[in-house]
Swiss-Prot record:
GO terms for molecular function: structural constituent of ribosome. GO terms for biological process: translation. This is Large ribosomal subunit protein bL27. Gene3D superfamilies: 2.40.50.100.
Amino acid sequence: MAHKKGGGSTKNGRDSNPKYLGVKAAGGSTVAAGTIILRQRGTVIKPGVNAGIGRDHTIFALVDGIVSFRNGRNNKKQVSVEPCC
């Protein structure tokens, strides 16, 4: 028989903080240079033309333009920024 009843509950009750990952600027939306387009863990989606990648794999716009998602080489997803104006 157990002599300590409350031990199990102390091993539970913790939760990690939200990381707010995902697409921040949808395809077809207008972005300014430096705008974050996508936050991700690892390069699930690769940067294309006029899109840069940060050290935490964040993809951002290098120029003002319109966001475009497409399938690139080897069926890998890719995000580009098409310059406008």
